């Protein structure tokens, strides 16, 4: 695989930070953060809608809306490793206990809840998709965006997010599982500032949040970073000015 594009805009919601300036300071070692620091209230989501969304979904929709206000988008791709596991757990718990299931939990338990709420709130009549590819969800979202750009779409919004993992699942998960909410959003356009190629990954390790690794390298103005997926290693080359 070999894909290329350029980044036109970035937004992030994580560690209690909401501006790219704060996150750039963190990426360069000039700001200390606590991974599970409380996140600020959404800037752009109505309160009644925000209450229905999982913690990471709120961040993802809010970050996407921020970029939609600054950019004329032609498509959107959301991705997530965790998906809506918070709502799923509540649905399963209700079934196991033979109790009524919350309509909100049921309707928000689908993987495209984030992108669906984004398109509704932004009133964006553009092609949208939600990518779930396990550990490789973010990188495959970039592939989806690249294909769209190659088919003459101009600007694609890519948002990757994670939610807090319910404690029940922590006992069955990898010890380095990222279990706090985070959302990273990019507007991509045609270009060659960033090139990604792949090679086999024979190790049983992977980056537990590919989008975060990618963003930190980008903000540090690194020339290259390697991101491990489940079966492939992604070599990312940055030639941004």
Model feature map: region roles:
Residues 61-64, 132-155:
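Active-site-proximal alpha-helical scaffold in enzymes
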Residues 1-130, 160-241:
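Conserved "HGTGT" condensation-loop signature of ketosynthase/thiolase-family condensing enzymes
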């Amino acid at each position: 695989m070999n894909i290329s594009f350029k980044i036109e805009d970035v937004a992030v919601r994580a560690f209690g930070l909401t501006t790219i300036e704060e996150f750039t300071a963190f990426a360069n070692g000039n700001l200390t953060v606590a991974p599970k620091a409380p996140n600020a209230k959404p800037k752009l989501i109505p309160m009644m809608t925000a209450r229905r969304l999982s913690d990471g979904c709120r961040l993802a929709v809010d970050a996407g809306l921020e970029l939609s206000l600054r950019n004329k988008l032609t498509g959107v791709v959301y991705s997530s490793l965790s998906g809506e596991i918070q709502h799923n757990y509540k649905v399963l718990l209700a079934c196991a206990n033979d109790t009524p299931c919350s309509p909100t939990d049921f309707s928000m338990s689908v993987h495209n809840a984030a992108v669906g709420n984004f398109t509704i709130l932004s009133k964006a009549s553009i092609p949208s998709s939600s990518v779930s590819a396990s550990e490789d969800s973010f990188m495959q979202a970039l592939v989806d965006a690249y294909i769209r750009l190659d088919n003459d779409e101009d600007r694609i919004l890519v948002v990757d997010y994670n939610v807090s993992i319910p404690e029940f699942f922590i006992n069955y998960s990898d010890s380095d599982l990222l279990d706090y909410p985070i959302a990273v959003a990019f507007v991509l356009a045609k270009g060659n500032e960033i090139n990604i190629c792949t090679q086999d990954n024979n190790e049983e390790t992977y980056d537990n949040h590919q989008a975060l690794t990618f963003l930190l390298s980008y903000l540090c103005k690194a020339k290259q970073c390697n991101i491990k997926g489940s079966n492939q290693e992604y070599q990312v080359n940055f030639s941004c000015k």
